[in-house]
Every structure is written in structure tokens, then in C-alpha cells.
């Protein structure tokens, strides 16, 4: 099963859909050049048309001098806006090298960034980097929080660099807690926050590497308890079948995405092992954008790349063909002539011409929207 698709591979992303990808990255190098894993990640983001990318275990000490490239810089290269929230364990950053196990991060691309509330987007307050969040705020009061978290894998060794040992040391040194398991602490702290965010009105999407069976163990049960958090395991619910192993050498479903009932899923699947960049399977979830930010007209956007570019002949051709087809189908040239010949008063002529002009503007916008896709991954713009 680990070499098969669970669910149905989504096609080209439709209008009104937000596509979220999630996976355990199993480490990403910080360099821009010669970085095959980063290049593959950008290719996947481009090919799948991702709006949100959730990664855990990026394994970077973000304070190390060699990790000078931020996530926005690493994943920029296309034409869409990029925003990111990334976290790691800051308490041991000065005592280790550029590699640090654990860490979580979220990336957002394109028009959806207009709804991103950066001040409301949070990181793990302990500074351990156990989770990151992005908050979307719509104009109608609807807001959705996306969470990416990593529950540490149990380790019996005391003095090593695993996330479990890092968090154990933090509890002993900073909280004088010598007994609580970091995994229990993760579950308690995240569960408390999820309740608080929900009470504040947030709709929630939770992407986790639970490092335990999400159906039978404590963390998954906490998330889906109908008398408690009441989250929905998105892939299993949508496909009607519980998910199988998510780690390429494992036998259990240890990763998952959970949503609140007011988030509408239009497709959900898990790709085979090896499809993504890490050693866990890649999740692809399509969500109705209106269920994340509410209905209504799009927000005013910052100046960004336009789809219509006259230096690209194939784009101009596609734009012109689409526009001319709509002009013919809706008889706008004939209607313009009728406006002049069929009205006897100036106001009548003006009213009909304005209607024709309004229709032509709509057709021009539609033609531009369909003439090409904006890239959000590694392929830099080139007029060739």
C-alpha cells in the first residue's frame, strides 16, 4: 500500500480551491545552488499548484551563520508571492552546528497571501519549534488557522541531538520538570492551544507527524474525540478508508491532517513513498477557499506579476483568441453599432455603450486569467 496512491490524484486546481501539501521533509539544506531536494520541492509546488506547503523536520538551526537563506528566499524563483513561518529549538542554537533535528514550517504562495495575518501567525511559545501556525482572515469575519507540528519520536538516550532529547533537556533546565515525557507535554500543550483557538472562533487545519498510530494512540484520539476537540481526520473521512503506513519503512499511519467540521474538503489523497522529498508520504488536500476565508469579492492585491505578458508570443495568442471568441459569441461589435443606430436620445446611446464597455472589460479580464499560469516554484521567469 505504501507504493500506491491512497485516494484520487487531483487534477488541475479549479477556481475557488485552495491546495495544501504536507510532508515530513527529513531535512532540507539551506543552500540555493546544487540543492536537489529544494529543486524537487519547488517542482512539486509548481506542478501541483500548491497554495500552502507544510513541512516538519526541516532540521535546520536557523540561527547558524551558514543557514543565511530564509524560507522566502529559498522558495522564491517563480512569479507568485511567498510568505513563510518557520520555527526551531532556539535554546540550543548557540551550542550546535547548522543541522538541528526537528523544526516545523509553513509556506504560502500567490493570492492566498492577501488573507494572511502575519501578526496572528504564531510559533511554539516555548521556543522549541514544536509547531508553527498561519492565520487567514477573511473580510466577513471568517478566519482559519493552519498548524504544522512535530511530535518527537521517543528516545532512551539522554545526551543526543534528537528532538525528544532536546525537549527533555529544556524541561529539566528551564522548567525543573524531571518526569514528564516530552510527547505527553506536546499533546497537552497543543491540545490546550487548539481549544483556545477554537474558542476564539478559528477554523482549524492541523498537519502532524504524530510518530504514533493516529487511530489508536493518545494524540489521534485526543484530536478526534467527539466530546473534546472533535477534529476530522481529513483523508480517511473523504476517501472512506483509513490511511495506511505513512513512513517508508513503517507499518503504521503516523502522519495526518485534521480539520474542524466547518472546513470543506473537496479532495484528499496521499502519494506513494518517494513521490515527495522526504521519507514520509506526501499529503495533498483540496479545500474550498470560501470555507477558509468566507465568501465575497477578492481583496485588493499588491502589485504582482501579470499573466498577460507581450514578450511571450504564445500567451498573447491565447489571450487574443479567448477575447475574440467572447466578442463574437456575445456579438459585442454588433451591439456597439446598434447602440448608435437604435437610440434617438443621447442618454440611451450612452447607457448602451457603457454596457458594451462593461462586458468587454469582463471578457478582457477573463482572457488574461486564462492565458497562462503564474509559477510559484523554482522556474525563474524567462521570455524565451
Residue ranges and their predicted role:
Residues 29-31, 61-66, 115-116, 154-158, ...:
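Short catalytic/ligand-binding loop motif for oxyanion handling, primarily in non-cytosolic enzymes
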Residues 20-26, 41-67, 102, 134, ...:
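Active-site beta-strand/loop signature of hydrolases that rely on acidic residues for catalysis
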Residues 1-75, 166-171, 175, 210, ...:
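N-terminal, active-site-proximal structural segment of metallo-dependent hydrolase catalytic domains
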Residues 80-108, 214-221, 229-266, 275, ...:
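Active site of divalent-metal-dependent phosphoester/diester hydrolases
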Residues 167-202:
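A long, amphipathic alpha-helix that forms part
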Residues 2-6, 26-41, 84-92, 114-118, ...:
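Eukaryotic beta-rich interaction modules
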Residues 59-154, 271-273:
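Structured beta-strand-rich core segments of catalytic domains in phosphoester-bond hydrolases
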Residues 135-174, 263-384:
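Surface polyanion/phosphate-binding segment centered on an Asp-His-Pro turn
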Amino acid at each position: 500500500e505504501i507504493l500506491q496512491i491512497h485516494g484520487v490524484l487531483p487534477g488541475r486546481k479549479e477556481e475557488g480551491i485552495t491546495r495544501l501539501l504536507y510532508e515530513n521533509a527529513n531535512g532540507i539544506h539551506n543552500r540555493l545552488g546544487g540543492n536537489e531536494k529544494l529543486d524537487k520541492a519547488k517542482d512539486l509546488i509548481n506542478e501541483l499548484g500548491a497554495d500552502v506547503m507544510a513541512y516538519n523536520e526541516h532540521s535546520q538551526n536557523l540561527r547558524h551563520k551558514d543557514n543565511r537563506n530564509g524560507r522566502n528566499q529559498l522558495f522564491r524563483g517563480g512569479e507568485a508571492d511567498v510568505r513563510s513561518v518557520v520555527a526551531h529549538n532556539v535554546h540550543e542554537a548557540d551550542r550546535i552546528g547548522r543541522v538541528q533535528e526537528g523544526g516545523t514550517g509553513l509556506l504560502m504562495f500567490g493570492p492566498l497571501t492577501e488573507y494572511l495575518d502575519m501578526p496572528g501567525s504564531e510559533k511554539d511559545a516555548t521556543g522549541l519549534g514544536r509547531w508553527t501556525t498561519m492565520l487567514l482572515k477573511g473580510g466577513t469575519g471568517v478566519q482559519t488557522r493552519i498548524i504544522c507540528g512535530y511530535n518527537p519520536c521517543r528516545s532512551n538516550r539522554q545526551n543526543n541531538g534528537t528532538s525528544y532529547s532536546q525537549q527533555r533537556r529544556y524541561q529539566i533546565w528551564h522548567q525543573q520538570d524531571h518526569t514528564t515525557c516530552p510527547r505527553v507535554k506536546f499533546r497537552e500543550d497543543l491540545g490546550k492551544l487548539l481549544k483556545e483557538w477554537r474558542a476564539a472562533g478559528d477554523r482549524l487545519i492541523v498537519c502532524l507527524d504524530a510518530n504514533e498510530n493516529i487511530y489508536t494512540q493518545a494524540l489521534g484520539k485526543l484530536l478526534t474525540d467527539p466530546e473534546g476537540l472533535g477534529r476530522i481526520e481529513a483523508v480517511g473521512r473523504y476517501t472512506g478508508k483509513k490511511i495506511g503506513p505513512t513512513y517508508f519503512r513503517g507499518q503504521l499511519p503516523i502522519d495526518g491532517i485534521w480539520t474542524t467540521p466547518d472546513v470543506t474538503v473537496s479532495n484528499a489523497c496521499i502519494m506513494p513513498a518517494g513521490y515527495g522529498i522526504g521519507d514520509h508520504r506526501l499529503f495533498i488536500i483540496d479545500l474550498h477557499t470560501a470555507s477558509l476565508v468566507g465568501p465575497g469579492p477578492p481583496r485588493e492585491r499588491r502589485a504582482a506579476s501579470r499573466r498577460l505578458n507581450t514578450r511571450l508570443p504564445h500567451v498573447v495568442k491565447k489571450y487574443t483568441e479567448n477575447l475574440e471568441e467572447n466578442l463574437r459569441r456575445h456579438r459585442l461589435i454588433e451591439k456597439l453599432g446598434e447602440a448608435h443606430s437604435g437610440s434617438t436620445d443621447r442618454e440611451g446611446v450612452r447607457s448602451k455603450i457603457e454596457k458594451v464597455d462593461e462586458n468587454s472589460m469582463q471578457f478582457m479580464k477573463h482572457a488574461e486569467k486564462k492565458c497562462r499560469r503564474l509559477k510559484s516554484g523554482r522556474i525563474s521567469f524567462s521570455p524565451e
